[in-house]
């Protein structure tokens, strides 16, 4: 899965470069339309075929589609993050397999925090926004058996990519906040919640 994701990301970069060089993408509107077509194509392939070797192609089209949608909405940051969050939600429930639901969880969380960062540049708000993500990840770890028992049969397959997406998102969020650790800010807010989570896990 890791190799497929890395390969898909690299292919998406080269593919986007080709679209730019070939002048296929000339305006924000064309970028938005092509991006939506890529997302729809990816979801269609994912629902009809779950062949492993198609994972890399789905990743390529999905990442390229999200990047094109972001470029098409770059003049409206608020609409950009909302559109990406909605894309993540639809992808999670409409796609099959592991890769796309996994990426959709990461996309939704990034869009959610990006929207908060756009609305407020306060580091305190971002710390508070990280707490629900960490809390959901902690909850899924503590009550994994109960969650799997209570889920409907068609949603059980979504648990693994959901949990994996939360795990990767938590690592990226904590790493991202630590980059600006030298800037004076009340980081003790996030530290308190992290210690509470550790104590709950120990118990």
Where in this protein do the model-derived segments appear?
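Alpha-helical multi-pass membrane segments and their bilayer interfacial helix-loop junctions
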Residues: 1-203
């Amino acid at each position: 899965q890791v190799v497929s994701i890395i390969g898909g990301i690299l292919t998406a970069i080269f593919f986007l470069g080709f679209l730019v060089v070939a002048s296929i993408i000339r305006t924000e509107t064309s970028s938005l339309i092509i991006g939506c077509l890529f997302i729809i194509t990816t979801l269609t392939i994912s629902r009809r075929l779950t062949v492993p070797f198609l994972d890399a192609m789905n990743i390529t089209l999905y990442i390229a589609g999200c990047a094109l949608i972001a470029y098409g909405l770059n003049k409206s940051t608020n609409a950009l993050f909302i559109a990406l969050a909605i894309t993540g939600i639809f992808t999670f429930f409409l796609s099959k397999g592991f890769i796309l639901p996994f990426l959709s969880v990461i996309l939704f969380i990034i869009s959610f925090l990006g929207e908060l960062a756009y609305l407020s540049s306060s580091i305190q708000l971002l710390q508070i926004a990280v707490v629900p993500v960490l809390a959901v990840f902690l909850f899924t770890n503590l009550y994994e058996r109960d969650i799997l028992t209570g889920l409907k049969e068609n949603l059980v397959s979504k648990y693994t990519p959901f949990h994996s997406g939360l795990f990767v998102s938590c690592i990226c969020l904590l790493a991202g906040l630590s980059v600006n650790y030298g800037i004076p800010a009340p980081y003790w807010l996030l530290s308190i919640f992290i210690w509470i989570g550790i104590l709950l896990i120990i118990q």
